[in-house]
Amino acid sequence: ANAMATEQGFYALAAVWRRREGKNALFQLSDAPENKDAVSGAGKTAIGLPGKNAAVTPNAIKYPGRTFADIASHPSRRHIEALAARGVINGKSELLFDPESGVTRAEFCAMAVRALGLQLTGAQSSVFTDVTDADWFAPYVRTAYAFGLVNGVSEAEFAPNGSITREQAAVMTARAAGLCGLDTSLSESGVRDALSVFTDYRQVSGYAKNAMAFCLSNGIFDIQTAALVPQELETRAELADGLFGLLNLADLL
């Protein structure tokens, strides 16, 4: 009995580790049947928060063990692998992820829509003149726009190939958090407390302050440097970190 208890204890510890890593469950330790999804961890099925938009759904693990040669020693490796396993993010090729390259507005739409498990909006007259049905990203842009995740750079243009900055990523991520049922509002003092620990907090644009503070105070963004550099371009690795943090907070992993 003691040996069995010890063995189950080790399995439980392993399951907790896999849950933290964003991986699926290890074993079912109970004899009782349980309806579980492939995104479950340690006997727990990810179902999202009670107040989430009904269209937001967890992603099952589709590609277990997916990784890339250029992230082996990268600090964002486990987040990238967890999202890649769910089909949320792809590499630049089968072997390379290119973690330090920038993210376009179209790429953000694709990753965010997949992360939230949103059904793609069908072909229709585009809101933006620079997004056509022939573009691979068109359904993702339409869907992200329909759910309020993104806006155009003008009433007519979306600028799909434009890069996004760290503060722009914060705004879009906070909008996604709202869809997930999270309260993204902060008091003025809450915003100040979250931002003022960084030396360049005054450089955060007014429109992005609440969103940036929300992402920081909830651990969605884990910035370990003294400066926020909010105008710096968001990297693919940083976006993976942010999406993983959001999904974990929203009980979607």
Predicted features along the sequence, with ranges:
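An alpha-helical repeat/solenoid feature that recognizes helix-turn-helix modules
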Residues: A1-E21, A110, S163, V171, ...
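Hydrophobic alpha-helical segments
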Residues: A12, V16-R19, N218, L246-L249
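Feature responds to low-complexity, polar/acidic, surface-exposed segments characteristic
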Residues: Q28-R77, N90-C109, V113-Y140, F147-E167, ...
